[in-house]
Regions:
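Membrane-embedded transmembrane helical bundles of large multi-pass transporters/channels
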Residues: 1-5, 69, 84-86, 97-385, ...
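Juxtamembrane "helix-exit" motif at the C-terminal end of transmembrane alpha-helices
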Residues: 5-8, 39
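Structured non-transmembrane domains adjacent to transmembrane bundles in polytopic membrane proteins
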Residues: 12-36, 43-128, 382-598, 602, ...
Length: 757
């Protein structure tokens, strides 16, 4: 029976040097069974006093008696565990499993037990991944803030809590259902522990967005029906002031119109939502092609989230509309009558006027927007990828304070040591490596110990590393169960996330270690968490071009088939790449450069690909919503300028509302204490803001005006090869379809993507 989740982080990359080093340590018995934590103690007057030794011994005795603890090494048992000035020391506590396998309550109790011994000048802090995860909150505040913000926007848009609640209910149901599936899947597929909040973030944003578009079209069709049967003018139906019986009779009488409105909304906006959802899923599944450990599981989980939210919008939402249709209809008509009584201007006038202004000065609009996006994207060129560590935690946490104490006492590189594996198991005693066979006593038959060659090689390496710029200290060779394998721990002079440390790893692998290998005939591998983070970052950078090509290529083919154009997909791809670059530039400025007082550090290695996948898909949504309406007008009028103005007029308000909701949901995650979620939320919020403001309002109308009729050009040979895919409902315009009939007040106000009947 499967109970609970089994989330686990796996950033190992088979084929990388750090992964090979880790495998060697596991095979040769050098890797401990469980994770370890450090209990850091400090006294400015020195730790080597009888009183402190007694207090620390009592603390460690009690710690050793705790559940999940298998071994404890006192700082007084290892001279290297006390700083040179004697003020900082650390005890190593080995757990009986990996950090995620040890119950959180056991880890919290360890913190409490150890810190109970503070006093008389002794300071006690705890560090390690097990401690960091124990201090993490359960979350929920960011998600709640996002939902509240989205609900407020919807209430202002629709003027009704019931109407505003339907998209939120649909999104919550979809996300909740997917969460249950993912919890079960975590027992069979590797899923990172940050998968649930990412699913919540994407699911809420996309789910509310999709439901909003269908619901908006439904409201529009209710107004069309009301305009046709006289209800809108007050000649039919019953408002809230009528009796209950009268309202029920009116609801029954309007039931066929409600059902027709729901069918049209699904047939029109539903097609758009389906296509938009498919583009997001394609982009997310593109991450799977990267082959980056648990990131593949994250890609599948988020793709499933989008799929379920899309299906919920196409199935659950119509059911809710059926249940609340009468009440929604009364609210829609009541609001429309109030707007008519106020003499409100035709909806979309402001957007139509804006489009005309951009069309009169297309080059100026294009230049301003592109320069702004380019300037914001420029910092992304200097982006450094990596992983946050305890040095990025809040200063109030014990893990951050332990990190700082160790850096003060032992140097900044102590928190990110490099583990060098010396593997002589494949070394040939008769190697031609500079006479190494003679120096090592080339005849094992003479009785020399098997471990002597690797011991000598490790000694040679240690001497070399001690003279290497950028290395502060090197441990003596550490033997393993296999005498042909030994370990050395090299402590960089720079912090784990510093660029100098990254350069040091490259220098060791490309220059220093190959020379020692040639001299000794022993293979050396650089491993450890710091080296593994570098490997992951480099692998991401190597595979990103393929990933981008797959996502952009497939999305462009879909757009080409839908809009029968070569230039439209090309324009969409370039603009999306520009907005994504700008959002990554914003993330770089804030989190890497430390703008607004944020702790400086690298951008999480997987953030760029995840932001690219999600933003590219969502940007395509807005592209499809807008261009579908423009395309429809173009097919009927063959006037490109008119088509663009009408496209903006009929989609501007709903795209703005949808974008505002996504921005609020995504930006709420900046409130999360998790640095990775903060980066993700900021990147997505900035990307959607730029897409809705600069791209949809300036660049798209400017480019479409400049392209004119050429925007819809498609070579005849290519037209024959591409399948015909239509999003907009293609029917003859006339009285039955609403053409020629007076537009219902507020109809344009709530048009989804402008996809008419």
């Amino acid at each position: 029976m499967v109970v609970g989740n089994d989330y686990r982080n796996d950033f190992s990359l088979p084929g990388t040097e750090s992964h090979q080093a880790q495998q060697t340590m596991e095979e040769k018995g050098a890797a401990q069974a469980g994770d370890s934590i450090q209990i850091v103690v400090r006294d400015e007057d020195g730790l080597r006093t009888a009183a402190h030794e007694k207090r620390v011994a009592a603390m460690l005795k009690k710690v050793a008696a705790q559940d999940s603890v298998t071994a404890v090494v006192s700082p007084y048992d290892d001279k290297s565990a006390v700083s040179r000035d004697g003020t900082v020391g650390y005890a190593t506590v080995t757990l009986d499993g990996l950090a995620e396998e040890v119950p959180k309550e056991d880890r919290v109790e360890l913190i409490d037990v150890a810190q109970d011994f503070e006093g008389d000048g002794l300071r006690v802090e705890l560090g390690g991944d097990a401690i960091r995860s124990a201090e993490e909150g359960e979350g929920g505040a960011a998600e709640g803030a996002g939902m509240l913000g989205a609900l407020i926007i919807l209430v202002f848009l629709f003027g009704s809590v019931v109407a505003a609640g339907l998209p939120v209910i649909t999104a919550l149901f979809a996300v909740g259902s997917t969460m249950g599936l993912i919890v079960m899947a975590s027992h069979f597929v590797t899923l990172a522990d940050f998968t649930p909040p990412l699913m919540m973030l994407v699911g809420l944003g996309v789910g509310i967005d999709y439901a909003l578009l269908i619901f908006s079209r439904y409201r529009t069709e209710l107004l069309v029906e009301a305009a046709g049967d006289g209800s809108l003018a007050g000649g039919g139906g019953a408002d809230e002031g009528s009796g209950r019986a009268a309202r029920k009779d009116a609801d029954r009488a309007s039931r066929p119109g409600q059902e027709r409105a729901a069918r049209v909304a699904l047939d029109a906006a539903g097609r758009t939502v389906f296509f938009a959802g498919c583009t997001v899923i394609i982009a997310l599944l593109g991450m799977y092609a990267l082959g980056l450990g648990s990131l593949q599981g994250v890609a599948l989980a988020m793709a499933l989230t989008v799929l379920v939210t899309m299906l919920a919008s196409l199935t659950l939402l119509p059911a809710l509309l059926s249940a609340f249709g009468g009440r929604i209809r009364r609210n829609v008509l009541k609001r429309a009558r109030r707007q008519a009584a106020r003499g409100r201007k035709e909806e979309g006038t402001a957007w139509r006027r804006w489009g005309g202004g951009v069309q009169r000065h297309p080059w100026a609009a294009l230049l301003v927007a592109v320069v702004a996006l380019g300037a914001l994207a420029a910092p992304a060129l200097n982006m450094r990828l990596g992983f946050a560590d305890a040095g990025n935690d809040a200063e109030s946490t014990t893990s951050r304070q332990a990190y700082d104490l160790l850096a003060d006492g032992f140097g900044p590189g102590f928190n990110g040591p490099l583990i060098v594996v010396a593997d002589g198991s494949d070394a040939d005693g008769g190697s031609d490596a500079g006479g190494g066979s003679d120096a090592n006593g080339g005849s094992g038959a003479d009785g020399e110990e098997k471990g002597e060659p690797v011991k000598d090689a490790a000694g040679t390496l240690r001497t070399t590393l001690e003279d290497t710029t950028g290395i502060a200290a090197v441990s003596p060779a550490i033997p393993t169960k296999d005498p042909s394998v030994a370990l050395l721990i090299a402590y960089p002079a720079s912090a784990p996330q510093a660029e100098a440390t990254s350069d040091l790893v490259s220098s060791l692998r490309d220059d220093i270690l190959p020379r020692v290998e040639q001299e000794t005939g022993t293979q050396f591998l650089v491993g450890g968490a710091t080296a593994a983070a570098e490997d992951f970052s480099w692998k991401v950078q190597d595979r990103v071009p393929v990933f981008v090509a797959i996502v952009v290529g497939l999305s462009a083919l879909l757009l080409m088939a839908v809009f029968r154009s070569v230039l439209i997909p090309l324009k969409a791809a370039l603009l999306n790449l520009l907005s994504i670059g700008a959002s990554l530039g914003a993330v770089t400025l804030v989190f890497q450069e430390g703008w607004f007082g944020v702790q400086q550090g690298p951008v999480e290695a997987f953030i760029p690909v995840m932001i690219f996948a999600i933003v590219f898909g969502l940007s395509m949504d807005y592209e499809v919503f807008l261009l579908s309406r423009i395309h429809e007008e173009w097919e009927h009028t063959k006037d490109p300028s008119h088509a663009v103005r009408e496209g903006l007029a009929h989609t501007g308000k709903v795209i703005t509302a949808a974008a505002a909701i996504m921005i609020v949901v995504f930006a709420a995650f900046i409130l999360s204490p998790d640095r990775m979620l903060q980066q993700f939320g900021l990147g997505l919020a900035v990307a959607i803001l730029l897409d809705a403001v600069l791209i949809r309002c300036l660049i798209v109308p400017a480019v479409m005006q400049l392209l004119g009729r050429h925007a819809w050009w498609l070579p005849a040979p290519l037209a024959k090869l591409l399948p015909r895919v239509r999003i907009e409902r293609h029917e003859q315009r006339g009285p039955e379809s609403g053409q020629g009939a007076p537009e219902a007040p507020g109809q344009g106000d709530y048009a989804d993507a402008g996809l008419r009947r």
